[in-house]
Amino acid sequence: MYRLVSNVASKARIARKCTSQIGSRLNSTRNYAAKDIRFGVEARALMLRGVEDLADAVKVTMGPKGRNVIIEQSWGAPKVTKDGVTVAKSIEFKDRIKNVGASLVKQVANATNDVAGDGTTCATVLTRAIFTEGCKSVAAGMNAMDLRRGIKLAVDTVVTNLQSRARMISTSEEIAQVGTISANGDREIGELIAKAMETVGKEGVITIQDGKTLFNELEVVEGMKIDRGYISPYFITNPKTQKCELEDPLILIHEKKISNINAMVKVLELALKKQRPLLIVAEDVESDALATLILNKLRANIKVCAVKAPGFGENRKANLHDLAALTGAQVITEELGMNLDNIDLSMFGNCKKVTVSKDDTVVLDGAGDKQAIGERCEQIRSMVEASTSDYDKEKLQERLAKLSGGVAVLKIGGASETEVSEKKDRVTDALNATKAAVEEGIVPGGGVALLYASKELEKLSTANFDQKIGVQIIQNALKTPVYTIASNAGVEGAVVVGKLLEQDNPDLGYDAAKGEYVDMIKAGIIDPLKVIRTALVDAASVSSLLTTTEAVVTEIPTKEVASPGMGGGGMGGMGGMGGMGGMGF
């Protein structure tokens, strides 16, 4: 195993040389794929088919009476889910142009999920409704650009209306209600999230893990969240969550950039000696040093991850020393005459688990001395009191919260791996929705906030008739969430929509779980404004783009034909890639 690490420098150079040879060889014999081009009505109609098929699969999950979707997987048992974005991500069509339309809807779902953490099904349903009407209008001779202007005008009006009606939430009961709704009516999950937020604060770090029992549990551990993610996606260990998860890792903290490949080899050898994963936090990891880490991760299956240090200047240095205190590490700093050439195991930090995403890193249960952590917290508190700068105070308070606040871990239990996976999807949605509700407030749920906002569009003035049609497209689309929720509950959606629009109480809605018309706020059926707003804005944006599309270019699939120049010798005499066969990975 040591030979793998120590030889990696020369292997990296060989790999780059071979890549260059391959590139020059391929450039001289490149094959260009033929393209299929479709125009106008035909192009939009084919994309619409993809949008409709994907939306039909996603919309059945909407609401408390939404149905399950079973997804075949290339490995393991089929996945059972009620999560809209999971369903959307799993769908690919054989027809290339259908797939273009579906891919753009998936972008809407992903964008909504990234910003608000929930509302993907609502965004998909709205996209389908807007694009369908947009296609019909353009086919009837309407000006596509005026339709787009009308759609934007209507969306801006609706967003303003929703913001004026939003109510901020503060109590634990209100937080539990939001979590319950987003978890498809699971009260236990809603209360668990409310308790976690109460424990670590609304800005605190809450993570979700597989439990080891049949029941859901809340555990609060000492931990820290770093606002930086992995330097390279090659460090990912869990493709499903797109995260790097390291159990019981060694933690190296370096104040400067790391570019010395020999120093990196020594660090890897120490981690291998202890048979433990490795987390590196430094200003940056560059060129050959980064290539060394990636090659060992991919070829030798060594669990390793590199993260850029958070902050800038003195603030970065302070953050690194905070992390060192939490994990019991020693910051490698040139000010003390330290470097990686004389590193030993006593300089590494330790913790129970590290989870790294593309945006942040969570360090759980650091092995630092409790007294040292307490003293550092007191030191930061003194600095807060002495500081006269609001900016400095804010940064110091952030550091204090990270050191002293802890991390809430939601351990999700179940009778089987399939059940735990499905519950984790719902808990993730509920947690994201709850954070969104705390951030921007809540509106009546069940789609009624959008439904009643459609009334505001009746009196909206436009520059011309085509823009008016654009406004009407949004007006009709805003009715689809209530319609879909009611239909999934087994009742006539059009009847429910009509009955709600006839009356004037803006909080009255249809409780699909009980089959009753109720005051949605009093019944605890609420939606985060951020989720609804993001879903509508993203849906309108992509639908407008699709409606104004006049041509679609896709590749015509061709059968693979072996090049006569390549022969059977592994790319024309490359000799097993110049010795790479002996890499031993």
Curated annotation (Swiss-Prot):
Enumerate the Gene Ontology biological process terms. Answer: protein refolding
Which InterPro entries has this protein been placed in?
Chaperonin_Cpn60_CS, Cpn60/GroEL, Cpn60/GroEL/TCP-1, GroEL-like_apical_dom_sf, GROEL-like_equatorial_sf, TCP-1-like_intermed_sf
Species name for this entry? Arabidopsis thaliana (Mouse-ear cress)
Q: Which cysteines are joined by disulfide bonds?
A: none
The entry sums up its family as follows: Belongs to the chaperonin (HSP60) family.
Q: Which HAMAP family match?
A: CH60 (MF_00600)
Q: What is this protein called?
A: Chaperonin CPN60-like 1, mitochondrial
Pfam families, alphabetized:
Cpn60_TCP1 (PF00118)
What GO CC terms are in its UniProt record?
chloroplast envelope; chloroplast stroma; cytosol; endoplasmic reticulum; mitochondrion; plant-type vacuole
Transit peptide feature, positions = 1-32
